[in-house]
Amino acid sequence: MSRTVNCRKFKQELEGLDFPPMPGAKGQDIFENVSKKAWQEWLSHQTMLINEKHLNMMDLTDRTYLNQQMDKFLSGEEYDQAEGYVAPEK
């Protein structure tokens, strides 16, 4: 049986992550309060932001920006979108 969490983003009980996605208190907070579904959506959005905004993960400013966007995304707040992105038709 998988563990469930009260997801901060979707405001409902959903399947939780199998392990903290990063070390430290922030990783533990995500593990305890963010669902697997929300985390997968964040990873996809993060990839779009890195590619479309040409973020350099070696640059502290870009990493800080991405962390701020992650916090907003996972909290259900308004977050930046990749300019010019058009979702593929299904």
Swiss-Prot record:
Gene3D superfamilies given in the database record:
Fe(II) trafficking protein YggX
Q: Is the Iron keyword given for this protein?
A: yes
Q: Give GO terms: molecular function aspect only.
A: iron ion binding
Q: Which UniProt keywords apply?
A: Iron
| GO biological process terms held by the UniProt record | cellular response to oxidative stress
Residues folding into a coiled coil are none
Which HAMAP family does the annotation name? Fe_traffic_YggX (MF_00686)
Task: Please explain the role this protein plays, according to its UniProt record.
Answer: Could be a mediator in iron transactions between iron acquisition and iron-requiring processes, such as synthesis and/or repair of Fe-S clusters in biosynthetic enzymes.
Which family, according to UniProt?
Belongs to the Fe(2+)-trafficking protein family.
Q: What is this protein called?
A: Probable Fe(2+)-trafficking protein
What species is this protein from?
Answer: Saccharophagus degradans (strain 2-40 / ATCC 43961 / DSM 17024)
Q: Source taxonomy lineage? A: Bacteria, Pseudomonadati, Pseudomonadota, Gammaproteobacteria, Cellvibrionales
